[in-house]
Amino acid sequence: MVEDILAPGLRVVFCGINPGLSSAEKGFPFAHPANRFWKVIHQAGFTDRQLKPQEAQLLLDYRCGVTKLVDRPTVQANEVTKLELHAGGRKLIEKIEDYQPQALAILGKQAYEQGFSQRGTQWGKQTHTIGATQIWVLPNPSGLSRVSLEKLVEAYRELDQSLVMRGL
């Protein structure tokens, strides 16, 4: 089981789709060696060094958190059903209302669209919010994603810089 890493007052909560088998086995988010999450958030400016998956709790020191739309682990995220994503979206809204981070970064367009009943989503900041929490849709850092490391870092850095500009 991969536990959420959440606390009140965070700058951002990164929301993955669901745990991969490697993450579920190890008990840490984004634990597969091919997953680029830890490298990307470091290079984008969220952390001052590249954390290891087993150091995930240290994200709180950087005012960052991690959650997921669906708890069920799978080999690939495309094994998660639309129904699971939609139910996960409802649960995610409750978590965000409870913790009220400045931003929620959903990692993947399809996850966002199915979890929140949206269509035609563009990358970046979205027009709707959860209370005062901005919603951002960022490319998924999975090793299966065809998005280059450079593009991932650029997208995540845009969120980090937006928070910095707001004094966060």
Curated annotation (Swiss-Prot):
Disulfide bonds: none annotated. Signal peptide: none annotated. GO terms for cellular component: cytoplasm. Keywords: Cytoplasm, DNA damage, DNA excision, DNA repair, DNA-binding, Hydrolase. GO terms for biological process: base-excision repair, AP site formation. It is found in: Cytoplasm. It holds the Pfam family UDG. Its EC number is 3.2.2.28. One of its GO terms (molecular function) is DNA binding. InterPro entries: MUG/TDG (IPR015637), MUG_bact (IPR023502), Uracil-DNA_glycosylase-like (IPR005122), Uracil-DNA_glycosylase-like_sf (IPR036895). It is an enzyme of class 3 (hydrolase). It catalyses: Specifically hydrolyzes mismatched double-stranded DNA and polynucleotides, releasing free uracil. It comes from the Bacteria. Binds DNA as a monomer. HAMAP family: MUG (MF_01956). Belongs to the uracil-DNA glycosylase (UDG) superfamily. TDG/mug family. Excises ethenocytosine and uracil, which can arise by alkylation or deamination of cytosine, respectively, from the corresponding mispairs with guanine in ds-DNA. It is capable of hydrolyzing the carbon-nitrogen bond between the sugar-phosphate backbone of the DNA and the mispaired base. The complementary strand guanine functions in substrate recognition. Required for DNA damage lesion repair in stationary-phase cells. This is G/U mismatch-specific DNA glycosylase. It comes from Escherichia fergusonii (strain ATCC 35469 / DSM 13698 / CCUG 18766 / IAM 14443 / JCM 21226 / LMG 7866 / NBRC 102419 / NCTC 12128 / CDC 0568-73).
